[in-house]
Amino acid sequence: MKIHEYQAKEILRKFGVAVPRGYLAVTPLEAEGAARQLGGGISAVKAQIHAGGRGKGGGVKLARSPDEARQHAEAMLGMMLKTPQTGPDGQEVRKVYVEEGCRIARELYLGMTLDREIGRLAVMASVEGGVDIEEVAAKHPDKILREWISPLTGLMPFQARRLAFGLGLTGDSVTAFVRFATGLYNAYVATDASLAEINPLVITVGGEVLALDAKMNFDDNALYRHPDIAAMRDPDEEDPKETQAKEYDLSYIALDGDIGCMVNGAGLAMATMDVIKLSGGQPANFLDVGGGADEDKVTAAFKIILSDPHVKAVLVNIFGGIMKCDVIANGIVAAAKQVGLSIPLVVRLEGTNVELGKDILAHSELKIIPADDLGDAARKVVQAARAA
């Protein structure tokens, strides 16, 4: 689960992480009032959406007066902010965060996430702050410092100091950085976060270490332990299809292609997308119906796929173990009739009750394209999508 910048900073404050003062605003007048509460001097008006790169898209503006803060808020609120992470359609700005300005001496990067290859939490730091860390990793990997944290000891002071020295910090800034990094680590662990990222982390002219921006993501499977964080979810920032999928306990992720996929099992779903790509197509989604899906769940999954206007063809790839092929077949038929299926549908079934499932599809009066194996199914659905 993702949250907004202002929410992440609210959490980090509780763990002693230094962040500038700021106030949320949902109207231009509230933004003006927030700037006055901050003293009426220089402030930053920041669009709140679940995407990075806001500054490049016009979503972060400096205001030198409360009146200018109001003007920036008027321009931002309601706009479709486009960044490299929002896609071409952009994301509507519904709220802004007005934050006090500071005199910046240096911009750095500090982030924490799980390194799945090593199986430990990785703390990353870089002198290249304020830019996309993925770009830095690709072009200048030598500029990223890393420390791997033992779950038995946590982040050790010597590791935080080593990062500070690697960033070229000296004097009181080293002490402030160690305190900052320790607070960020404590917040990451205590909240079951999957990502905690400060970009940029700034060193002020006075030597303070501040989180000028903050991003936190959380493990959905641990949210039952954090009802306060779960309450921070913003449905307006999520794909409606993904929200609907959660209601039916479906694993759904929207992608940019035009071939809808419905598969049982995450591994088979990823393999299906790979084979579609190898066959020259582009998957429109990842959708795992799981091993214990019933007819209603399959029907819901089918409707979610077909609600995407970019989908030109659908591939259903089922290996029936716990999941029975006849259940899938009945769900496909029910959903196709309910939504009035008008695009090509390729189905590959294998496993438990496969002959019964194929018989149900054959007598459904639907124009279903059968496939014998995954390679055959991928080729047929790519061809169908191109012809649609």
Swiss-Prot record:
InterPro entries: ATP-grasp_succ-CoA_synth-type (IPR013650), ATP_grasp_subdomain_1 (IPR013815), Succ-CoA_synthase_bsu_CS (IPR017866), SUCC_ACL_C (IPR005811), Succ_CoA_ligase-like_bsu (IPR005809), Succinyl-CoA_synth-like (IPR016102)
Pathway: Carbohydrate metabolism; tricarboxylic acid cycle; succinate from succinyl-CoA (ligase route): step 1/1
Cofactor: Mg(2+)
Residues annotated for substrate binding in this entry: 264, 321-323
Pfam families named in the record: ATP-grasp_2, Ligase_CoA
Domain of life: Bacteria
GO cellular component terms listed in the entry, alphabetical order: cytosol; succinate-CoA ligase complex
Binding residue positions for ATP: 46, 53-55, 99, 102, 107
Gene Ontology MF annotations: ATP binding; magnesium ion binding; succinate-CoA ligase (ADP-forming) activity; succinate-CoA ligase (GDP-forming) activity
Domain ATP-grasp span(s) in chain numbering: 9-244
Reaction(s) this enzyme catalyzes, per UniProt: succinate + ATP + CoA = succinyl-CoA + ADP + phosphate; GTP + succinate + CoA = succinyl-CoA + GDP + phosphate
EC number: 6.2.1.5
Record flagged with keyword Ligase: yes
Function text: Succinyl-CoA synthetase functions in the citric acid cycle (TCA), coupling the hydrolysis of succinyl-CoA to the synthesis of either ATP or GTP and thus represents the only step of substrate-level phosphorylation in the TCA. The beta subunit provides nucleotide specificity of the enzyme and binds the substrate succinate, while the binding sites for coenzyme A and phosphate are found in the alpha subunit.
Family classification: Belongs to the succinate/malate CoA ligase beta subunit family.
Protein name: Succinate--CoA ligase [ADP-forming] subunit beta
Annotated source species: Anaeromyxobacter sp. (strain K)
